[in-house]
């Protein structure tokens, strides 16, 4: 239900690992604008994890501004350097194929997790308001409704 996720933690590593545990998510670790630009163009993922305890002191707002500029200002999947676009896009498709085989369906995963943990994740004040209208997967929506009951 989200097109792109921006998250983080102290080092960014834990948040990245957590997001990469889910099917359909390719999360990169972004510390600076170069990381943002190369992740967007080489890896073409859909999530980034930032290290909020590193490099975000004095001038940190500039670092964030430049990260978002490089992450979203020039498109995605265009290769870096540009002449590497074809092999990089080919490798991205290979990775997507591996991940499609390696990960289980999210509905099945949610059903096998601790029910209290899942219910807590869905308990946010506006979760249902935002999730259900944006959810494009009816099976997933039905699973979430079932688990929220």
Annotate each predicted stretch with a short phrase.
Residues 9-14, 55-56:
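Gly/Ser/Thr-rich loops at beta-strand to alpha-helix junctions
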Residues 9, 31-32, 51-52:
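Short secondary-structure boundary segments
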Residues 2-8, 27:
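A short, small-residue-rich loop immediately preceding and capping a beta-strand
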Residues 14-27, 31-32:
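Short Gly/Thr/Asp-enriched flexible loops that form oxyanion-binding sites at enzyme active sites
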Residues 1, 149:
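Glycine-rich beta-alpha loop segments
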Residues 37-148:
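C-terminal binding/interaction regions
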């Amino acid at each position: 239900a989200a097109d792109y996720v921006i998250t983080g933690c102290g080092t960014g590593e834990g948040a990245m690992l957590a997001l990469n545990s889910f099917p359909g998510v390719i999360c990169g670790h972004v510390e600076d604008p170069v990381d943002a630009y190369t992740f967007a163009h080489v890896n073409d993922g859909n999530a980034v994890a930032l290290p909020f305890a590193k490099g975000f002191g004095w001038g940190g707002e500039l670092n964030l501004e430049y990260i978002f500029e490089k992450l979203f200002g020039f498109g995605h999947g265009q290769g870096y350097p540009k002449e590497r676009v074809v092999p990089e896009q080919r490798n991205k498709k290979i990775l997507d194929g591996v991940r499609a085989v390696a990960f289980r369906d999210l509905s099945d995963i949610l059903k096998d997790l601790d029910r209290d943990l899942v219910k807590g994740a869905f308990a946010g004040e506006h979760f249902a308001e935002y999730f259900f209208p944006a959810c494009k997967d009816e099976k997933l929506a039905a699973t979430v409704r079932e688990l929220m009951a």
